[in-house]
Amino acid sequence: MAELTSLTLKAALDGLSSKSFSSVELTQAHLEAVEAARALNAYVVETPDRALEMARAADARRARGEAGRLEGAPLGIKDLFCTEGVESTAASKILKGFKPTYESTVTANLWRDGAVMLGKLNMDEFAMGSSNETSAWGPVVNPWRAEGGNAQLTPGGSSGGSASAVAAELCLGATATDTGGSIRQPAAFTGTVGIKPTYGRCSRWGIVAFASSLDQAGPMARTVEDAAILLTSMSGHDPKDSTSLPVETPDFASFCGKSVKGLRVGIPKEYRVDGMPPEIEKLWEQGIAWLKEAGCEIVEVSLPHTKYALPAYYIIAPAEASSNLARYDGMRFGLRVEGGNLTETYENTRAEGFGAEVKRRILIGTYVLSAGYYDAYYLKALKVRRRIADDFDRAWEKVDALLTPTAPSAAFALGEKSDDPVAMYLNDIFTVTVNLAGLPGMSVPAGVDANGLPLGLQLIGKALDEGTLFSLGSAIEKAADFKAKPKKWW
């Protein structure tokens, strides 16, 4: 059944509609792959019974001629999405045993279209991390290994489980979320495609909040077209989320393979940072050449406030997190550690329930919001955020999209940066600006480094113009012809 798991989502949907195989067969093949790949620690909850039940229902609907857009396709769900009756912990001990009584809007949209749930995917605790090492359930392992090496590598974060599962063929696609790069950086580290859509394109209702003004759901998949198919289902206006945009959802897959001739693509000069590995620089130049060959006009642009993006992000995101995470007090759900009085119970619960990185960010966030520092840090960061958005607005007067690297390196070894939070935070250097400005950003696998590890290129688009990114992404995908797969060791 291995060949069923190596299909793209599009090929699997075609096979289901031509009755080459059933959803039950497809789902069973994936469940076996998931079971055999537990060494990757990609799934924190496996739901085989529910998956087969959903697959049988999908086959029945297809037989009645009522097939939805994703009918019978087995997917993995990041553990940040609430799934009714299935444990949803955001990879935190403080939510151990929490089974939501409702379904997140994004997952409800997928089930409406006939998708099948294989289980919940591991991630950094509360989506705070860039290496999937902050999970209370242990790190996720990247299915890729450096040539000639057997060190375990990070799949990136926070959507490391999603990235690892898609790359190791443990699902046809996965949901993920991106607050500062958590879809795009893991996609680059695992040779997969990930898109963070425009802020408000996908509903945040039922997604455990990290930084509410930055969080956005998106898909991870093995091809640009697969990501487009998933995003079409995930998107849509939701009155339950006040930041959800009341706009129509286009058929994103229709943009894949469209001519990009005449599109103007900007190259931000500030992204040529000191110490960028020559391989990343070379890949970027290669990407520029591919788009030129496809008929794009290349224009150098300036985003002068780029250098302030990381500091602004690491003030705004923790500030919002410190407010959002105040709801975890052991009273109504999740972990409770009793104390002598109410305050002590709060303290004991949080001391035991939150991991070190989450505590660090709550402390930073509480500090920058405190009297005397609010103006110096938080308000200043908000002003910088506005400037960053203005930089992009000026760039859009000249260009239709931007091309940059996704991450400053290929995947690194687990444990390599865990003692140095600043080195870890630098992983987001090319991605955070996109969240601060609320724009769509996509990572496409474009090559490998000297050790045979995947590298990605990032495309950034105008608000609500994901279509152009899918067209440019499929042009890069076609030119790069990235066929490399991780050699199976698990």
From Swiss-Prot:
UniProtKB keywords: ATP-binding, Ligase, Nucleotide-binding, Protein biosynthesis
Name of the top EC class for this enzyme: ligase
Pfam families the record matches: Amidase
Superkingdom per UniProt: Bacteria
GO biological process, one term: translation
Record: active site: 78, 158, 182
GO MF terms held by the record: ATP binding; glutaminyl-tRNA synthase (glutamine-hydrolyzing) activity
Catalytic activity: L-glutamyl-tRNA(Gln) + L-glutamine + ATP + H2O = L-glutaminyl-tRNA(Gln) + L-glutamate + ADP + phosphate + H(+)
EC numbers: 6.3.5.7
Any one cellular-component term (Gene Ontology): glutamyl-tRNA(Gln) amidotransferase complex
Family: Belongs to the amidase family. GatA subfamily.
Its biological purpose: Allows the formation of correctly charged Gln-tRNA(Gln) through the transamidation of misacylated Glu-tRNA(Gln) in organisms which lack glutaminyl-tRNA synthetase. The reaction takes place in the presence of glutamine and ATP through an activated gamma-phospho-Glu-tRNA(Gln).
Quaternary organization: Heterotrimer of A, B and C subunits.
NCBIfam families, per database record: gatA
Protein name: Glutamyl-tRNA(Gln) amidotransferase subunit A
Organism lineage: Bacteria, Pseudomonadati, Pseudomonadota, Alphaproteobacteria, Caulobacterales
Gene name linked to the record: gatA
